UniProtKB/Swiss-Prot annotation:
It is found in: Secreted. Keywords: Disulfide bond, Secreted, Signal. Disulfide bonds join 191-198, 194-203, 207-240, 216-234, 225-238. Residues 207-240 form the ShKT domain. Interacts with A1BG. Residues 1-22 form the signal peptide. It holds the Pfam family CAP. This is Cysteine-rich secretory protein 3. CDD domains: CAP_CRISP. Coiled coil: none annotated. Belongs to the CRISP family. Residues 42-171 form the SCP domain. One of its GO terms (biological process) is fertilization. It comes from Equus caballus (Horse).
């Protein structure tokens, strides 16, 4: 199961408010329908991913995903200061993670993403949070090695009071798995795990599938990938042998 903590920039009263059209030109400039905004979001994530400390040997390069963005925008439009349901942000059978950010002013997307990443100051690779109450899940999702699709949305929510600019990014496949949360990527020389599939320190050999059951490795040894059960439920294990997943 993915660890889906409530990860919020600031706390506020949770009430169902409807979005409105932001009058601030700064808000309009943040629309994810703009190609330059999509590029900014992707580039910011990739810049942070390729410069993690310690460096990563298996970090996938992120790309914009329109289906993920649609889900993120739909959730942002609800103006709810809480995470969406897992089924509402899934893309097909693929589970997706989510980061939320709220602000009193229309901050740039780069600033919002940097805010999530700044939780790294409370995180130690291989150990986890430095203190029991530290929030680090935004950071670990941003740098989760196998999350390679990103889509975001933003809404203007004036009835939320001070925090009226609502940013949502969703990531597929989801990160923050409990058994790996302290090591969100594999430490090593950049692209060491993806020779021949490297772009400026990030791996490009992503897997488009996700195993639907947890024991695909053992099932493959017992029945082989030609078995109908594995064809349906173990596509990652059977079709992504030389890919990062």
């Amino acid at each position: 199961m993915a660890l889906l903590p409530v990860l919020l920039f600031l706390a506020a009263v949770l009430l169902p408010f409807f979005p409105a059209s932001g009058q601030d030109p700064g808000f309009a400039a943040l629309s994810i329908t703009k190609s330059e905004v999509q590029k900014e979001i992707v580039n910011k994530h990739n810049d942070l991913r390729r410069t993690v400390s310690p460096l990563a040997s298996n970090m996938l390069k992120m790309q914009w995903d329109s289906k993920t963005a649609t889900n993120a925008q739909n959730w942002a439009n609800k103006c709810l200061l809480q995470h969406s349901k897992a089924e509402d942000r899934a893309v097909g059978t693929m589970k997706c993670g989510e980061n939320l950010f709220m602000s009193s002013i229309p901050n740039s997307w780069s600033d919002a993403i940097q805010n999530w990443h700044d939780e790294v100051h409370d995180f130690k690779y291989g150990v986890g949070p430095k203190t029991p109450n530290a929030v680090v899940g935004h950071y670990t999702q941003v740098v989760w090695y196998s999350s390679y699709r990103v889509g975001c949305g933003i809404a203007y929510c004036p009835k939320q009071g001070t925090l009226k600019y609502y940013y949502v990014c969703q990531y597929c496949p989801a990160g923050n798995y409990v058994n790996k949360i302290n090591t969100p990527y594999e430490q090593g020389t950049p692209c060491a795990r993806c020779p021949g599939n490297c772009d400026n320190g990030l791996c490009t050999n992503s897997c488009e599938y996700e195993d639907l059951v947890s024991n695909c490795d053992s099932l493959k040894k017992i029945a082989g990938c030609e078995h109908e059960l594995l064809k349906e439920n173990c596509k990652t294990t059977c079709q992504c042998e030389n890919k990062i997943y």
